[in-house]
Each structure stands twice: as C-alpha cells, then as structure tokens.
Regions:
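Feature captures the catalytic ectodomains and active-site-proximal regions of enzymes
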Residues: 1-143
Length: 143
C-alpha cells in the first residue's frame, strides 16, 4: 500500500435483533383498510390504503403499533428525506403506496397474506430507526 492510500471500511446499515413479530392477519380491522397487502420490508412497510379509510387506518394502526412503529404519509416520509436528497424517481409514488411505517423498536410486522402464512422469522433484520441500525462503524487504515 502506498503512503498516500487510505482504506475505508464501513457498512450500509446495521442490524437489530427481532424482539417481537406481528402479522397483520391478526388485525382484520387494519386489513380492511388496505387495497393490497403491505409490502417492502418487515421494519419499513408501505401500505396502499383505501382513500375513504385513511383516517380509520391511521387510528387503527396507531392504536396497536404506536409505540413500535412510526406511521406517516408517503408525502411526510419523502419530505423527511429518508431516501436521500435529489430528484424523486418517477415511479416512487407507485412503489411506496400512500403510507409508510418505520420500526422504532425491536419489532417487525411479517409480510404475510392468507395465501402465504407462517413464514419463518429471521433472528435479526434492518430498515428500522433504532441506533443499532442507523449507526455503523467506520474504519480507516493508513500505512
């Protein structure tokens, strides 16, 4: 390694042990608000909510998950730059639906449907807002 070389080692995200796993199949009052199953990640979920049930969805979701997930509209999520800065991809509105929920604790919501129940739960995961996931080490090595 030459004298003017620096090697930097880091990670793109940390990991969080899963402490509690939920399934929306246990909450039909939330499911009835959706036009399709939740998607994306078990700690960063997107929801397509029926336009006439947005208020009910917010109330029902927050009643159950307020202490473990931060629910926000997609507009709020994007305005907080969770996906970074710069121009928005033209398909992002289709991809995200109209609500996003980010885990703030050690919990996940399994991405299950009645056709695909009982998926195995990993021991740890990422995509939440805990320090274990947001703070990563940076190692710099010089000669």
């Amino acid at each position: 390694m030459s004298d003017d070389t620096i090697v930097i080692i880091s990670a793109d995200h940390g990991h969080k042990d899963i402490e509690k796993a939920y399934t929306l199949l246990d909450y039909p009052e939330i499911l009835e608000c959706l036009t399709m199953p939740a998607s994306l990640e078990s700690r960063a979920l997107t929801f397509n909510v029926k336009e006439n049930m947005r208020k009910e969805f917010e109330e029902r979701f927050n009643k159950v998950f307020r202490d473990e997930f931060w629910l926000m509209t997609t507009e709020e999520f994007l305005s907080k730059n969770f996906l970074g800065f710069g121009d928005k991809h033209p398909k992002i509105d289709d991809f995200l639906g109209n609500y996003v929920a980010l885990s703030t604790a050690g919990s996940i919501i399994r991405l299950e449907t009645f056709l695909a129940e009982g998926k195995k739960v990993k021991k740890s995961t990422h995509c939440g807002l805990t320090p274990d996931e947001m703070e990563v080490p940076v190692i710099a090595i010089t000669k």
